[in-house]
């Protein structure tokens, strides 16, 4: 019940504040400040921070529906990343900077500079929490050399050696086997689940409304088959994404995240393709809202690793990290009480 309250609060806020018009405006270079301030004032950004540190002290499982709502509304600011970053910083006893925080894995160059490519939603973030070979750095976006990446709000960032040395280096400790990519993959899987559901619902509504040859196109068997395949992908992905957020505290289970991100990334291509096939040419137009979601499906599919990467992680766990049968591994992974 408490989880539903958080999800309902997120849904109501995003319906009013994260409209398609605002998403378009931010993508076109408009300021995200008003939207971010609304999220900050509602307390979502500190939801994973322990209560003794001024947050709500929630666990990942309690925020699945919030992240799913963020995906369904194509939220153009790094809310989920900020939640994770602030929780990690609080756990390390480090100061939490104001504003939105993106997450990235960085590569230290021989000259000491730090490269991050791409940084998801880095164009609308104030800071970036970077994991690299020597630990962690918390760096301001304003100081970085910035280049555009494939998705309009993602960027490639570079900081000089002097900037890296001067930046805070929080002593963040992750449990064995976890890294920043795993944390972000669990978040992105939840957002993919929300976007997939929204695309499916919009497509289903369109199929029921669009008339052709005297009846809704949803009455034609070929369209019904496409919708059935979409629903299979959408609900399987949602179950997997919820599994990726299962457990207590801030840290997910890496194998469960692998299952979640692989299944959601796999569904992204199939659902986007079917949605545009059913909508026809109109679905590709800039004025139609469907593209706000399907562009994100394609971008998020690759964020923090595509299905190929996470299938490899799951396969390695089966071959090298598990002594029992395949069925035993499936049972232990999908038992969310474990």
Please annotate each region the language model reported:
Residues 67, 86-87:
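A cross-family signal for key residues in well-ordered alpha-helices
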Residues 1-73, 185-338:
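Alpha-helical interface subdomain recognition
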Residues 54, 85-86, 108, 284:
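General alpha-helical segment detector with a strong preference for membrane-spanning helices
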């Amino acid at each position: 019940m408490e989880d539903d309250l958080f999800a309902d609060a997120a849904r109501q806020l995003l319906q009013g504040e994260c409209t398609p018009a605002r998403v378009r405006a931010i993508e076109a270079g408009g300021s995200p400040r008003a939207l971010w301030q609304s999220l900050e004032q509602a307390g979502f950004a500190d939801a994973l921070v322990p209560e003794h540190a001024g947050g709500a002290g929630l666990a990942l499982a309690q925020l699945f529906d919030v992240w799913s709502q963020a995906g369904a509304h194509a939220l153009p600011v790094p809310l989920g990343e900020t939640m994770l970053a602030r929780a990690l910083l609080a756990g390390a006893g480090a100061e939490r900077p104001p504003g939105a925080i993106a997450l990235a894995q960085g590569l230290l160059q021989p000259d000491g500079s730090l490269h991050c490519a791409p940084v998801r939603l880095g164009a609308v973030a104030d800071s970036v929490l970077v994991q690299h070979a020597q630990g962690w750095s918390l760096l301001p976006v304003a100081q970085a050399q910035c280049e555009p990446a494939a998705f309009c709000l993602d960027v490639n960032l570079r900081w000089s050696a002097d900037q890296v040395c001067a930046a805070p280096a929080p002593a963040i400790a992750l449990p064995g086997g976890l890294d920043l990519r795993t944390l972000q993959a669990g978040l992105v899987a939840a957002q993919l689940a929300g976007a997939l559901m929204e695309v499916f619902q919009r497509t289903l509504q369109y199929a029921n409304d669009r008339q052709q040859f005297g009846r809704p196109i949803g009455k034609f068997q070929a369209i019904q088959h496409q919708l059935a395949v979409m629903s299979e992908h959408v609900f399987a992905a949602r179950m997997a994404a919820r599994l990726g957020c299962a457990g207590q505290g801030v840290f997910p289970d890496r194998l469960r995240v692998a299952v979640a991100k692989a299944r959601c990334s796999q569904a992204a291509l199939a659902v986007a393709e079917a949605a545009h096939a059913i909508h026809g040419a109109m679905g590709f137009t800039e004025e139609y809202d469907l593209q706000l979601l399907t562009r994100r499906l394609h971008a998020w599919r690759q964020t923090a690793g595509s299905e190929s990467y996470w299938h490899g992680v799951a396969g390695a766990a089966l071959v090298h990290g598990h002594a029992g049968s395949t069925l035993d591994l499936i049972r232990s992974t999908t038992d969310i009480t474990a």
